[in-house]
From Swiss-Prot:
GO biological process, one term: chitin biosynthetic process
Organism of origin: Cryptococcus neoformans var. grubii serotype A (strain H99 / ATCC 208821 / CBS 10515 / FGSC 9487) (Filobasidiella neoformans var. grubii)
Keywords: Cell membrane, Cell wall biogenesis/degradation, Glycoprotein, Glycosyltransferase, Membrane, Transferase, Transmembrane, Transmembrane helix
Observed effect of gene inactivation: Decreases capsular diameter. Decreases extracellular vesicle secretion.
Catalytic activity: [(1->4)-N-acetyl-beta-D-glucosaminyl](n) + UDP-N-acetyl-alpha-D-glucosamine = [(1->4)-N-acetyl-beta-D-glucosaminyl](n+1) + UDP + H(+)
Induction: Induced by high temperature. Induced by the antifungal agent caspofungin.
Name of this protein: Chitin synthase 7
Function: Polymerizes chitin, a structural polymer of the cell wall and septum, by transferring the sugar moiety of UDP-GlcNAc to the non-reducing end of the growing chitin polymer.
Region (Disordered): 1-34, 56-92, 763-789
EC supergroup of this enzyme: transferase
Compartments where located: Cell membrane
Main location, first listed in the record: membrane
EC number: 2.4.1.16
Amino acid sequence: MVRHDPFTNSVSEDSSFTPSVNPSTPYPQSGHYRPYYPPQLTYCQGQQGYQYDHTGDVGYGGRSRRHGSWASVNNEDNEELTPLTTGPASSSTFLTTDPYLSGGPDLPLSSSSASISSAGADFLRRQTVPRRGATIKKIKLTNGNFIADYPVPGPVSSSVEAKWLNDKTSNEFWHMRYTAATCDPDDFTPENGWKLKTTSYNRETELLVAITSYNEDKILYARTLHNVMLNIRDICNTKASKFWRRSAEEGRPGWQKIVVALVADGLDPMDKQVLDVLQTIGVFQDGILKKEVDGKKTAAHIFEYTTQLSIDATPQLVQPHPGDPNNLVPVQIIFVLKQENSKKINSHRWLFNALGRQLQPEICVLLDAGTKPGHKAIYHLWEAFYNNQNLGGACGEIHAMIKKGVKLLNPLVAAQNFEYKMSNILDKPLESSFGYVSVLPGAFSAYRYKAIQGRPLTQYFHGDATLAARLGKKGIYGMGIFTKNMFLAEDRILCFELVAKKGEKWVLQYVKPSKAETDVPEQAAELISQRRRWLNGSFAASVYSVFHFFRLYRSGHGPIRMLFLHIQAIYNIFSLIFSWFALANLWLTFSIIIELLPESANINLFGTADITHWINLVFAWVYLAFLMLQLVLALGNRPKAEKGLYILTLWVYAFLSFYLIVCSIILSVVAFKGALRDGGSIGAKLGNLFNSTNGVLVAAIMSTIGIYLIASFLYRDPWHMFSSFPQYMLLAPSFTNVLNIYAFCNLHDVSWGTKGSDRAESLPAISSSKQKDGETAVVEEQQRSQGELDESFKQVVRRAVAPYKPEDADEKPNLDDQNRTFRTRLVVVWLLTNAALAISIQTLNGLDTTKPLVEACLPNSYNPENGTVIVSTNGTCITQALEHDGDKLQDKQQIYFQAILWTTFALSMVRFIGCVFYWAMRQMGRCWRRN
């Protein structure tokens, strides 16, 4: 079998085809079902070019094709087969011109370079513009609720493969359902008249995959959604699982057991270009959003549709090709667009309480928009639950997106990459072995739905600001600042509550084969702001889990599991203590080691002892000065307004870290040489090495680096040790001194509250009227014709696949930032000048000369390295030596204090003279005062 490069345009002639631009049969009208598939095909005599979706997916394999048969290059677990996309060399059933070439004849240049702000304005216009001569349609309300089905554009419904169109009684592929939910998520129930279209198909839901978003751009959103659809395709096509294979054999395709929920946190912050992407695949439509229904404010706009289309991160349109076994399968999508920005916890309440209660899924997979699940990542998570009935939650490996190593040129990205890697190699496996993973990251994790019901979700949702009035003192209004910070890491609360659930024995697990990529902050200001929430939330949640450990005794865990949990609790307590004192320990390590080198090893890196002493002293002052600077910055400035000072701090601490590393290496070499010179056996030499002061340093360095290396090679993932470890070592002090200080100084910032939507105010409101029977409530709405819908859809596709040009996000300091900056500069100068004066007076003597003076009084035979010895000494000489340096310093300091006292006296005398002069003039004035 001949195998081809999967990224070439070479395909055998007999297997080439091109979807017709103008199908012989028109688009199906609403309510009718398309009698044909595929569209008329035009077979080319020459080679037809194809474009593969090769956007740098990590771990994705290739594919080869010859005479219509597909062969795996690798085995099924390691191979990712991506569907074909319509590229410049192929035609599209959607548009008569290539939508991917910006500035084409039917695509104005402005549309491909539209800014985000103009996209938002255009979005508002499309929601409110009236259509003249439109047909008026009456829509019945369901128990007073607005729930309506809308025809999808013809190209969307025409894209579905014929093999999925068996049910002629269903409009699943022809109509999209819109629900204007005017209730709280807890009240979104069939009893209250709210019923999802997906539940009407009477299908069991095995997997509910949720993607939560805030203001991510269309590239980030498409990256996540497209790779989720690839994962669903791989689940349905897998031959490794009897569960999914049996389901397909019984006539229940796997995709019918999977639902994708998209939850957007607010109409106002959402990138409107994302809505173009969703509209292209049929999950959204312009002009149907309702602000109010009979005076009841819409809380969420819910769209439901089953689509076989996708847009990848290029962005390019991905549509099925007849006979291609790598086509995407249909995906049931529920899009929940919240009217207001009410935070991620509220988005999860819509997911678990509104959608979950109706769908009753077995497993819920949580993803953040921008996270890119790898090949079979979702399948590996599901497999872990399927094979362990006591598994309540799981997470995969999240690693930094490094763009084939290009982003590692940024030291911040490299340092974070090392953090992610070592966490996945050391921390997560350890916690998984105990059965309690302290945090299942919300960006990529999964929960068994029945496991989180009850107290876990109840406690979790106490942090929802929209429930504050209902919960009273149990909500955020009754929480202290420490408890509020705990909910900044709400995923940690859910993890602990799940493991400690009364009468249950749920465990948490780390699933190594399940991998996902995520973007990491590339700027210092972004990293500082992100870690504030992480550090404060994780610290508060760690304290919470320690103080509530007794609740584990009410769970159903066995004695062996409880033993493991006790060991883990002790480990967590020690880790918490070390984290608390990290600031002091880092300073002590730095100050002791840089002084240890010239004192114990008698090595002066800067020539003489005097110069080395002063340079080390300056380094220590600089260290403390920038530490003090962090306190001033953190207490009064936003990181984005002080980018320059924060970047300077990172560079300074990186230099000091480099100096510390050099000193440590030299001390280690000296210790090894000393051990080799000592007599005795190898055991004695090792004992002398590790019992000495330098030996402890050697042991610490060897154990840390050695453990990192061995563990990385054990997991066959050592490359970060060479590409990211040096950057991490240089930035490690900044992670403690900068990030921790900023986090604790902003402990009060818990970012509660909701933000209203200005754009929602411009949406239309609807009011119902009674029918002639006086009971049925209906609303009147303009109905678009299929032709108008298809015509406007062309513009939607053009906007969706237009090259993305992000808006300039360089935020300029506002007036308040400028005022704070001036205050910060003034306070820093004030503190530094005072500190400089105090330190300079305390160190007027320079290098301590007491030791050589004392040694001069001792006999020449004295050798302190021989142990405790008794020698004859000159007591008077030693006394004078000890007093000499102190007297010398005292003499210099007395001069300074004399100057201070005389200056104080002079200033006081000036004030006194002024006082006397005023008194004299006042007394003398009485003589010539006129009455």
